Amino acid sequence: MYYKGFDLKVVPGKIVNEEIDHRFACYAESDDGITWRKPELGLVEFQGSKANNIILGSGPHGPLDVDAARFAIFKDTNPATTSDARYKGIFRSNKPQGLIVLKSSDGINWQPMSDAPVITDGAFDSLNLAFWDEYRGEYRAYWRAFEKPSIPVPHSNSDGMRSIRTATSPALIHLSPVQALSYTGPVNPVDL
């Protein structure tokens, strides 16, 4: 299981800080889905020690500035994937802003698949997803953005209405033109 971890400083009733460099992607294992082990991976230093289960910390990774708390990892079932990319993860990059793709042979040690974000048009402030779509034979990504509404909407964010976008790719690097999801039925301009 992959999950996000935070090193938050709190006082009763409030969070004192939630800085980006205190966010982590973590890993745990289970044989039954009930009892979990957090293996000591020795990858990322936290509070002076690498004896932890952190697979990736937020901050610079080559030319990318990874936000390790906004990610989705999947086991790649594409029959053509190489052994060094059996696992893939889509992470948010802060500078440059966008979504980046990392690859791993074991789901623990990660390397960027490119030096720049593969998706740059969006908000990227929610759970961003990517996966191999075996029925269509391509990768698919979903992420959140803001769209300007066609009609005035009370209590709307000044950036527009929340929306979900998607794109596809044969290799998860160069994606098709971005499409906003549309919904059938009565129009109800409510934020997603």
Describe each region flagged by the PLM.
Residues 2-128, 132-192:
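Beta-rich carbohydrate-recognition and catalytic domains
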